[in-house]
């Protein structure tokens, strides 16, 4: 494994430099350094400030690829200070962004030279490219001007630029009636799952271990629901999203208790969207779907991730392809007319032919939307923790696969409506939601674009309070551990009350 050291004179832009280098060397062991040491590295970078420039130097002890021929080099990126920022930049936030963009532009050019390759999303290391595109358009730029900015300033490929601009415009149309100033959305988390997937890093807990305490969890959650509704009185609730985990691990009477409480506390009138992520096919039953159907739920998800049985077995999803089809048909039979299906590309052992097989079977089911995720292996996932066990597995994702998913979505009458990126994504690609007309997931857009507050309830819930028209975001975290959430529910409520009081 390649070993890379990055020496920082100070911590300015440390995260951005690290993430961009990691994107070019995804398999490398990368160390951040704050003083010179004796350790040996295959490639060493140093980042230091020199008056109105940042100087980035590199040196390596051996070639890391055939394209890398130079052993040493240096680049500089001009920066602005408050004194010399005579270009209309008024605030510290904008000044920092300008300097960050300049450093990443120069570093990206160096990394392209070193490795002989480019990245589809250029020097963007954040997770919300469409938010960047939307900001440009809302500032008054024409589509062509925003596209040129993304290509020339951020070095995004023409294909990804077109995707971001297309999605930004569709998001604007979908959100045109949402009140950002007075409205908010509600997320309710159910952290239990029938089993934990190989790639999962979310706060999910095996149902078999926790099934004797699910009543306690629902009771604590209902208490948080009631108290939060009082805090938000006078504000308009736009969307509700019940996710997880797997919400349908709850029994029918627990589902009814939760949804009764939400309705009594917040009311269901005037909602733009109400989603329940039914999720894993092995947890979906007629009784549970009928219970959900008693409430004004407008959208559900049935999530196979793949329609290849051998892959399902490898990743620890203890259901069959046939169960996915049965759950989907059952939902249609019961009258659900807006069903999403989540898919993952880049799963272990899957090549383009297996992805094609999945897409063909999904096409036959004819969902109203699909969300295509590129596999991202987080630190907390079993796939990463026990990576030596899985090192012989292949993880294939490429532009051809991404093009195939888009082509299939278009053939099914769907267009892209939201996208986001994650760290450590296979192929450095993206997650894209596709939907038919009037079937897009509004909550999905709102949480990505950070246009309005998201109030999150349940274990592991992370509320986002939006200040200054999205210029500042503050998070309010609930504890992740289920036992702690139950025992410390009063503390979670007070934590939320204090934060919301400062926002209101």
PLM region spans:
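A C-terminal junction/extension of Radical SAM enzymes
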Residues: 30, 34, 380-457
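Beta-strand scaffold of nucleotide-dependent catalytic cores
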Residues: 189, 301, 370-374, 444-445, ...
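Radical SAM enzyme core and accessory elements
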Residues: 1-143, 152, 221, 437-504
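N-terminal [4Fe-4S]-dependent radical SAM core
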Residues: 115-118, 138-186
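Canonical Radical SAM [4Fe-4S] cluster-binding loop centered on the CxxxCxxC motif
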Residues: 181-216
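Key residue(s) within conserved catalytic/signature motifs
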Residues: 166-167, 199, 276
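Short beta-strand motif preference
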Residues: 56-58, 188, 302
